[in-house]
């Protein structure tokens, strides 16, 4: 099993994700190879909260070109973690 800090890369803090916090939904960028169970265990271990469900979205890399050199940006994976109603808040997202 991977270290939880290798699975959760960083929180995604945007206007849209801040609106979801009222519904106890938190958004993280996660490892591309991580599955829902690994993300759930990592969030519970790092933040000490109870997770109800995990939704995951995959983003493919964009085509970029600089002069005659071309390539793709790295692909990404985003997880929206929903906490149980009796779970405490994650302090990282407090404003």
UniProtKB/Swiss-Prot annotation:
Q: Does the keyword Iron-sulfur apply?
A: no
Q: Does the keyword RNA-binding apply?
A: yes
Q: Give the matching InterPro entries.
A: Nucleotide-bd_a/b_plait_sf, Ribosomal_uL23-like, Ribosomal_uL23/eL15/eS24_sf, Ribosomal_uL23_CS
Could you tell me which PROSITE patterns the record lists for this protein? Answer: RIBOSOMAL_L23 (PS00050)
Under Pfam families, the record lists: Ribosomal_L23
Sorted alphabetically, the Gene Ontology cellular component annotations on this record are: ribonucleoprotein complex; ribosome
In the record, biological process GO terms are: translation
What Gene3D superfamilies does the annotation carry? 3.30.70.330
Q: Name one GO molecular function term.
A: structural constituent of ribosome
Q: What UniProt keywords are attached to this protein's entry? A: Ribonucleoprotein, Ribosomal protein, RNA-binding, rRNA-binding
Tell me the superkingdom of the source. Answer: Bacteria
Described by its record, this protein's role is as follows:
One of the early assembly proteins it binds 23S rRNA. One of the proteins that surrounds the polypeptide exit tunnel on the outside of the ribosome. Forms the main docking site for trigger factor binding to the ribosome.
> What does the subunit section of this Swiss-Prot or TrEMBL entry state?
Part of the 50S ribosomal subunit. Contacts protein L29, and trigger factor when it is bound to the ribosome.
Record's family? Belongs to the universal ribosomal protein uL23 family.
Matches recorded under HAMAP family? Ribosomal_uL23_B
Protein's UniProt name: Large ribosomal subunit protein uL23
